[in-house]
């Protein structure tokens, strides 16, 4: 995907922008991003909230699936997000990566990993997405 598309994705309004996710790559084979942990990412104990991990995983899976679906004239929406929290994080830069497991005509499945600055796994997940033809409304 072109640098213009990555720049476009980074300018989109919404939750991912508010969370400070910075897309690094976006192709039908891999989507990556990074973000610096801030207080807005914390839950009550001062560690990154599990919803942030779920959100970054679903965001990257959705971008990748949308690239695939877009080539077919489809839109995609999430059906299921199963994220495991492996290691607590309080601060630092996190990097996330998503890759497809299957890119079917009606559903796609993507796996994703979130790692800390030392490369240690902090969360991993799997997202199942529904591919909708243009005749369907969201």
Language-model segments: residues:
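Terminal targeting signals and extreme-terminal segments of soluble enzymes
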Residues: 1-138
């Amino acid at each position: 995907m072109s640098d213009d598309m990555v720049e476009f994705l980074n300018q989109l309004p919404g939750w991912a922008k508010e969370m400070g996710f910075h897309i690094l790559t976006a192709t039908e084979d891999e989507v990556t991003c990074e973000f610096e942990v801030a207080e807005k990412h914390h839950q009550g104990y001062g560690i990154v909230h599990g919803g942030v991990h779920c959100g970054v995983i679903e965001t990257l899976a959705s971008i990748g699936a949308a690239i695939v679906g877009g080539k077919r004239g489809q839109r995609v929406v999430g059906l299921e997000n199963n994220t495991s929290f492996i290691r607590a994080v309080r601060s630092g830069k996190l990097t996330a990566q998503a890759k497809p497991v299957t890119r079917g005509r009606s559903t796609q499945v993507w796996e994703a990993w979130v790692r800390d600055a030392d490369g240690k796994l902090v969360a991993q997940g799997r997202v199942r997405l529904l591919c909708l033809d243009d005749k369907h409304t969201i």
